[in-house]
């Protein structure tokens, strides 16, 4: 896929901002049902994008390099998160951090938002080798075989959730069908109607593991794509910039979301939490970009992610 799909960058912007918002403990505690709704679709959509954009038509050395530069930042940040969880009183606090516990979290059961990269690495590995061995199968046969392999990995090794893997598989199916992204995920203002009905009438189905979760993910993507053409050029540039740099936010946002806990007393006068949310999200995004710019200028990015620059500046 040579041409960048800007609609995907826009969707990534929307979902990464929602991720940051509801990783803010104050916001999540104040609006628990909204958090449940957002958790139904935001990372599910990222897995769909990852499956859709995955390119497995490459040699083993190039693929190994790709996996290496996914694993290195994952390992660094997950290691830091695990150590932090053993020190700070966070919800995922580890009471007794041992080497066995550390290795378990790093290789098998990651903590924090880094589970996404862990899942992605596993899915890429399985997808690559199935593609190398069975690429000539029909679309249906290939996707079924890949699904069986991913299901086997999830059930026998218990290192990924099959609920999450299914969204990656959906992205692969969409990509290999050779149909345009917006032909499958059609922009629609009407998508807000069934979405609202699900939220009001079926709160128990708000889980990414349910059929309703799949439908909700599709509806939110569809509605968001309907909004995209109406963005002003300035808003669009900002959104696409954020969308192209979601990896930086995923990697470094936990550092800054913890700091935002200290902001709560200053916004106690606002019962809606809107001001707290706006300031905190801007702080987290800005902090992530500052870290990345410093890494780029010091030459750390080359050793951290295999690229001279981790920060991507869109060329429109």
Segments from the language model and where they lie:
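Alpha-helical transmembrane segments and their immediate juxtamembrane cytosolic regions
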Residues: 1-316
